[in-house]
């Protein structure tokens, strides 16, 4: 019985020149001599094949992020933190990308959320000279890379829209080296820049916008260490809208006279599942037999997370939030049920950890955490370390998962009573809500009529008043929120040049 299938495609030449051909090798040698292949070496070290037919954008981005040595802040498999297509799910659910690919603007969104510095241009708002300038810039350096979004038809290739990184440039021939991530289809190849530019001028039917190119480089600061925004839950659209649009309106329409009233207006209106939108990032690894031990790197990361948690709990805003949320003060809580209790959090994180360590693009609902236990021990520097150890079951398989928990010890006195309450040791709703409020745009509070209260609010949320680590966390979340709101409005493909501050 016959079986249908394809084994690669013949590269149309011209216009392309196969990188491995004698002519392709000669172009490479000449470009190396002219200094326009500097980006090639790091990129080719992390060259990968897209794992799904529609994952060209994700493969291109993960390849570039790894080439730039940007730390994803979470593990891929085993002990390794590494960008993989399955981890790029901040701006669009993976199942949707798998079904229909990703737009240029949403790939830009993903690059921002992954912690990269991004400059992006639609072809309709650029020029071939502008494009050539940036290709030359990145080809003579190894600290920035270009990803091109183009239509294959302009290159006389089969297929439609495609993403791939540019691995170098030959100035004399005006040709770019395409490191095609669809390696099952076409090999790396040189292509005249004019043809590539033509391909970028095709309109993407899903957005009505032309394709384009983006420059990706390392940021001056690393992405969020402890907190991040997530669009995995289907409610993220409504939550982003609430945070950016509804809160300013509520503060304008309500007669707020003090901080407690401001918090009341916000907390009582919060969507019930807002905690699905902002998460604290747990460090996971495969379960170990015997006495647990931490690498120097794991200790350093845990120490930074704990310092950020302490800095959150030292802010004036945290004290107001904790006081408001305490039962004797308000009776309001932004969580529902027992989802904020430590056993529930531990079981949930273990299931997510097993999913990530298994490298599967699926739902952690398929995993069941059979048991968890807490291990506490002292490191060599006599510092206490807490780890949740869980056994997760998926079908007939079991996976041991260890979760490092950042902790912060302290006491908090409630301003409405004489009682003193212990602060929970793991990141909890009070911390998360505080960070979320700090991350709102500065314009959020502009509608407060009481000038004295407005001044007090500004002092509490001012980025300048925060310590350095927390300042970086808050700025990262502000960028994420701004980008996700643009995604929610469908504007991410329209205003690529809008600042993200």
UniProtKB/Swiss-Prot annotation:
Keyword Iron: yes
An individual GO BP term: cellular detoxification of cadmium ion
Peptidase C83 domain: residues covered: 1-221
Tissue: Expressed in roots, nodules and leaves.
Induction: By cadmium.
Activity: how regulated: Requires cadmium for activity. Also activated in vitro by Zn(2+), Cu(2+), Fe(2+) or Fe(3+) ions, but not by Co(2+) or Ni(2+) ions.
PROSITE patterns on file: PCS (PS51443)
GO MF assignments: glutathione gamma-glutamylcysteinyltransferase activity; metal ion binding
EC number from the UniProt entry: 2.3.2.15
General remark: In roots, Cd(2+) and Zn(2+) induce preferentially homophytochelatin (hPC) synthesis whereas Cu(2+) has a major effect on phytochelatin (PC) synthesis.
Keyword Zinc-finger: no
Domain of life of the source: Eukaryota
Pfam families in the cross-refs: Phytochelatin, Phytochelatin_C
Chain's role: Involved in the synthesis of phytochelatins (PC) and homophytochelatins (hPC), the heavy-metal-binding peptides of plants.
Reaction equation(s) it catalyzes: [Glu(-Cys)](n)-Gly + glutathione + H(+) = [Glu(-Cys)](n+1)-Gly + glycine
InterPro entries: Papain-like_cys_pep_sf, PCS-like, PCS_N, PCS_N_sf, Phytochelatin_synthase_C
Protein name (Swiss-Prot/TrEMBL): Glutathione gamma-glutamylcysteinyltransferase 1
PANTHER family named among the record's database cross-references: GLUTATHIONE GAMMA-GLUTAMYLCYSTEINYLTRANSFERASE
Similarity comment: Belongs to the phytochelatin synthase family.
Positions of the catalytic residues: 56, 162, 180
Keywords, alphabetical: Acyltransferase, Cadmium, Copper, Iron, Metal-binding, Transferase, Zinc
């Amino acid at each position: 019985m016959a079986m249908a299938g394809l084994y690669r495609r013949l590269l149309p030449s011209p216009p392309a020149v196969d990188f491995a051909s004698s002519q392709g090798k000669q172009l490479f040698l000449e470009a190396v001599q002219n200094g326009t292949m500097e980006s090639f070496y790091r990129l080719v070290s992390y060259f990968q094949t897209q794992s799904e037919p529609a994952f060209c954008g994700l493969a291109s981005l993960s390849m570039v992020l790894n080439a730039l040595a940007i730390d994803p802040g979470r593990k891929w498999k085993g002990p390794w933190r590494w960008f993989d297509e399955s981890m790029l799910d901040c701006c669009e659910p993976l199942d949707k990308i798998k079904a229909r690919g990703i737009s240029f603007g949403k790939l830009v969104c993903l690059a921002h959320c992954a912690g990269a510095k991004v400059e992006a241009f639609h072809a309709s708002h650029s020029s071939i000279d502008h494009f050539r300038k940036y290709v030359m810039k990145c080809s003579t350096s190894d600290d920035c890379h270009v990803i091109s979004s183009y239509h294959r038809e302009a290159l006389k290739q089969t297929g439609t829209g495609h993403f791939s990184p540019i691995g170098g440039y030959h100035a004399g021939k005006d040709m770019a080296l395409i490191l095609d991530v669809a390696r099952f289809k076409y090999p790396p190849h040189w292509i005249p820049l004019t043809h590539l530019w033509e391909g970028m001028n095709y309109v993407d039917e899903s957005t009505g916008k032309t394709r384009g190119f983006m420059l990706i480089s390392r940021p001056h600061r690393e992405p969020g260490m402890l907190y991040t925004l997530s669009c995995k839950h289907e409610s993220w659209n409504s939550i982003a809208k609430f945070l950016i649009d509804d809160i300013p309106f509520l503060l304008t329409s309500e007669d707020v006279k003090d901080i407690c009233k401001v918090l009341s207006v916000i907390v009582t209106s919060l969507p019930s599942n807002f905690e699905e939108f902002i998460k604290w990032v747990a460090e996971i690894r495969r379960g170990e037999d015997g006495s647990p031990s931490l690498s120097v790197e794991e200790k350093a990361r845990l120490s930074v997370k704990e310092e950020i948690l302490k800095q959150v709990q030292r802010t004036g805003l945290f004290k107001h939030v904790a006081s408001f949320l305490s039962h004797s003060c308000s009776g309001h809580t932004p969580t529902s049920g027992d989802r904020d209790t430590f056993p529930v959090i531990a079981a949930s994180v273990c299931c997510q950890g097993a999913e990530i360590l298994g490298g599967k693009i699926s739902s952690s609902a398929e995993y069941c955490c059979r048991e968890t236990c807490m291990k506490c021990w002292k490191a060599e520097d006599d510092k206490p370390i807490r780890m949740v150890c869980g056994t997760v079951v998926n079908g007939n398989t079991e996976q041991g998962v260890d979760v490092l928990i950042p902790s912060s010890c302290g006491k908090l006195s409630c301003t409405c009573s004489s009682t003193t309450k212990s602060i929970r040791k793991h990141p909890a709703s009070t911390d998360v809500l505080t960070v979320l409020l700090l991350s709102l745009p500065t314009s959020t509070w502009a509608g407060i009529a009481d000038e004295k209260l407005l001044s007090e609010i500004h002092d509490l949320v001012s980025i300048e008043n925060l310590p350095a680590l927390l300042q970086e966390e808050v700025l990262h979340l502000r960028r994420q929120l701004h980008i996700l709101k643009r995604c929610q409005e469908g504007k991410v493909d329209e205003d690529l040049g809008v600042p993200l501050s």
